């Protein structure tokens, strides 16, 4: 066996088997196996559980009427907004206070958290939503449970309309989150949690009659699991996630790009341009067309070949007269 083949075999022995897979997984999930990380995951689970229990509980219709009154819509909107503001204030310093899979996906797309971390976050959020909705179902009398706050598109609207509405209201929510939590800003003096809560409340005031105003895939997922109602459920994942990614990308890369990121991108583009250009720098050459037809470039020296006379006329060194700089 040759030395190259032997080296390849040794590498395969180390990285081709089960041990390499284990090491690769450990590297991919670096930072996950810490106490702080699991505290953050638990915080997302608990925050979502409480949020769904309190906010979805406000949608329970105790009066027996088919449609909620305008005053009830205001109550629902305020309950959702104040609930999320409270949870962000309580758990924001532990987990970042995502409490929304769409927000977590936006954070991944803007390189604020890792993909591995987002997987655990979204799983915890969905489990919290299911348990929160389950507790609400258990403590609510059967005759008033109704749909348990399952989000549905209005009967006069198509799925496309619902998708667009969810995209828009989630866009404004996530843009508010990025703008309020921007560490580069020095003009933010109010409560970040309250700003996020107001954004959620505004989205509900506008969109309750359209789609139920989800803005949060986990919030829709929990009641849907408990009630087994999956009608147009995909809208409440696709719409919010697209809106969140658009908002995060626009804020981070267009409106308020990070200075360090801009510098790195500029350096990368400059380096790529230099590599594409090559080792020679073009300069103006005032010689006649006949004289420059056969120009051979060598590092530091220019040679002109006169075909008629078969002579090799050596040009001046680039240090003496600039013909081409290397």
UniProtKB/Swiss-Prot annotation:
* Gene3D superfamilies, per the entry: Glycerol uptake facilitator protein
Lipid addition sites, S-palmitoyl cysteine: 15, 20
Q: Which residues carry this modification: Phosphothreonine?
A: 292
- Name the keywords, alphabetized: Cell membrane, Cell projection, Endosome, Glycoprotein, Lipoprotein, Membrane, Palmitate, Phosphoprotein, Repeat, Transmembrane, Transmembrane helix, Transport
Q: Where is this motif: NPA 1?
A: 100-102
From its record, what is one biological process in GO terms? Answer: cerebrospinal fluid circulation
Q: Which residues carry this modification: Phosphoserine?
A: 114, 183, 279, 288, 324
Function, as annotated: Forms a water-specific channel. Plays an important role in brain water homeostasis and in glymphatic solute transport. Required for a normal rate of water exchange across the blood brain interface. Required for normal levels of cerebrospinal fluid influx into the brain cortex and parenchyma along paravascular spaces that surround penetrating arteries, and for normal drainage of interstitial fluid along paravenous drainage pathways. Thereby, it is required for normal clearance of solutes from the brain interstitial fluid, including soluble beta-amyloid peptides derived from APP.
**Family the entry assigns:** Belongs to the MIP/aquaporin (TC 1.A.8) family.
Q: What is the annotated quaternary arrangement, including any partners?
A: Homotetramer. The tetramers can form oligomeric arrays in membranes. The size of the oligomers differs between tissues and is smaller in skeletal muscle than in brain. Interaction between AQP4 oligomeric arrays in close-by cells can contribute to cell-cell adhesion. Part of a complex containing MLC1, TRPV4, HEPACAM and ATP1B1.
In Swiss-Prot or TrEMBL terms, this protein is called Aquaporin-4
The encoding gene is AQP4
